[in-house]
Amino acid sequence: MQITDVRIRKISSEGKMKAIVSVTFDNEFVVHDIKVIEGQNGLFIAMPSRKTPTGEFKDIAHPIVMDSREKIQNEILSAYAKAIEEQDVEE
């Protein structure tokens, strides 16, 4: 499965959540609401999730294989860095 599009839908300079992203696979399947989060060890992605009645968050969709997660994260963080760079140029 190939990542065919990464769309940075919202960028925030405040707080730990830096962006909300949509990723399209093979021009056929899209996953919305992936978050770019700033953690203690740098940026990472959080897959879309929902809160359970017990207050725990569960992923709605997520990669099963670690290599897939790394590939998705690398593509998203690369697109995020490019969007930030373009935003700085426009300002």
Curated annotation (Swiss-Prot):
It comes from the Bacteria. InterPro entries: SpoVG, SpoVG_sf. Gene3D superfamilies: Stage V sporulation protein G (3.30.1120.40). GO terms for biological process: division septum assembly; sporulation resulting in formation of a cellular spore. It holds the Pfam family SpoVG. Keywords: Cell cycle, Cell division, Septation. Signal peptide: none annotated. Could be involved in septation. Belongs to the SpoVG family. NCBIfam families: PRK13259.1. This is Putative septation protein SpoVG. It comes from Clostridium botulinum (strain Alaska E43 / Type E3). The lineage of its organism: Bacteria, Bacillati, Bacillota, Clostridia, Eubacteriales.
